[in-house]
Amino acid sequence: MTLPVGIDYEAPLHDLPVSRATWELDAGRAAVLVHDLQRYFVTPFTDGCPALAGALAATEQIVRAARAAGVPVFYTAQQGDQDPADRGLQGDLWGPGMSTDPAHTAIVAEVAPSETDAIVEKHRYSAFARTDLADRLAAAGRNQLIITGVYAHIGVTATALEAFQREIHPFVVADAVADLGAEQHRRALELIASCCGVVILADDVLGALRSNDGSSEASGGWDERIQSALSGLLAPDALTAFFADPDSDLFELGLDSLRAFDFLDALADDGLDLDFGEFTRSPTLNWLRRQAGSVAA
């Protein structure tokens, strides 16, 4: 048995189930998980399927807002041509799975990861099974997980259930997930709301993320300190571009190694001590905001 074809439905967003949990989403404690949005898993949907189109658009907005807020973003991705012994019981239900062809393995372009995002190689329904996702979340000081992607009643639900059992609060975004059909989508939301997580809409997620989007008040003034430290080290137009695009690379904008040391020294004087090697691997505003957020926490 393989994946079905011709999936085409409207997401069941009217009368969403009331979540038993009353947790409030906190951007300072949250991470985003983009679940299984590889081309192999979205090919079964018809072109323009409303549920998938909505899920991709909502996921794209959430990912952009998360990066701007310094919230970690994780992606799950399966490997192609899995050994049958490693694929295990999944092969009995879904066949051999994807090949190594990028037409199968690539994450769809609308929500493609940036260099600052993390990829989790997935092995089973749950994103936690045989992965280091839990360790990565703990290392980042995150105990809330915003989940988007496919398929709602399979991997999304399995991940939400295991997150709950690991004391991680799952927030499943009703309009940022898709499924094999409306009934499976609805049942997934009902199960999650009833026993393991909060069912939430993308607009509410965006509101929570944007309240921590790196503004002066939300970031404890670190944007101003970063800007002050870079003043005189970058051309004014490059400095403007750096803050306009939080994923832009400082070195591509004109910062050299000597000036980078001066920049890090200035931040250290303000209480943010950063490793030069780590900084050179991710010289972006989003990375700096995440480090500043961990100091503030």
Predicted regions and their residues:
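Active-site loop/turn elements of alpha/beta-hydrolase fold enzymes
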Residues: 37, 78, 175
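Acidic/polar short surface loop at catalytic or gating sites that assists cofactor/ion binding
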Residues: 82-100
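Von Willebrand factor
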Residues: 66-85
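Phosphopantetheine-dependent thiolation modules in NRPS/PKS and related acyl-activating systems
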Residues: 217-297
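Hydrophobic anchor at the start of a short beta-strand
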Residues: 73, 170, 274
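Active-site-adjacent betaalpha module
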Residues: 1-31, 64, 68, 95-218
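Short, contiguous, helix-prone interaction/anchoring segments in small proteins
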Residues: 25-62, 74
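Conserved catalytic core of two-component sensor histidine kinases
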Residues: 53, 157, 261
